């Protein structure tokens, strides 16, 4: 089909629904177009569990996941930069070989694109949780309802990837 028109549709989906990543892959898991990085296509997302599950069931699936840095780099420079979390050495913390965490924690969905009676492709979308203050602030408001004691917030919310804080308020 028309890659430019498909790209524009994915950009609208990303904007309207607040996703960070929106891609379409073919039935073999090969990337056809990315909303963020339309020039990066032809690589495979067939190893992603959500893609495999859609291929198996022909039904939409959702969940959380971890993407390695090479996968997130395919989504564009901005998301790759947002993924990086500096590791600050602290007492009693497990020693790390890298000065930064470069894996991306995401909330993801994948849904079949059906044409007639055949699987034409898969829509994959995700929200990046690394450094996502908007998400963690919304989560905190849901849990703690903006309660305060003596003018101070009752609670905080933090998302961990292993022992690294990827988002906190």
Regions found by a protein language model. Name each.
Residues 20, 48, 71-83, 88-96, ...:
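A short beta-strand signature within small-molecule sensing/ligand-binding domains used
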Residues 1-75, 94, 130-168:
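Extracytoplasmic/periplasmic sensory segments of membrane signal-transduction proteins
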Residues 98-101, 115-118, 149-150, 166:
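Short, solvent-exposed loop/turn segments that connect beta-strands within catalytic domains
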Residues 84-90, 102-140:
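Conserved beta-strands of PAS-like sensory domains
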């Amino acid at each position: 089909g028309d890659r430019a028109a498909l790209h524009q549709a994915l950009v609208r989906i990303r904007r309207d629904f607040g996703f960070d990543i929106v891609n379409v892959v073919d039935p073999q898991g090969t990337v056809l177009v990315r909303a963020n990085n339309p020039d990066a296509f032809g690589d495979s997302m067939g190893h992603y569990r959500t893609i495999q599950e859609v291929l198996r069931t022909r039904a939409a699936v959702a969940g959380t996941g971890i993407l390695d840095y090479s996968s997130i780099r395919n989504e564009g420079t901005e998301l790759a930069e947002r993924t990086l979390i500096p590791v600050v050495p602290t007492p009693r913390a497990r020693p790390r070989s890298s000065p930064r965490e470069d894996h991306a924690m995401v909330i993801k969905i994948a849904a079949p694109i059906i044409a007639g009676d055949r699987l034409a492709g898969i829509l994959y979308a995700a929200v990046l949780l690394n450094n996502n203050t908007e998400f963690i602030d919304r989560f905190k408001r849901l849990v703690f309802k903006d309660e305060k004691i003596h003018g101070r917030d009752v609670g905080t919310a933090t998302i961990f990837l292993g022992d690294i804080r990827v988002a906190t308020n």
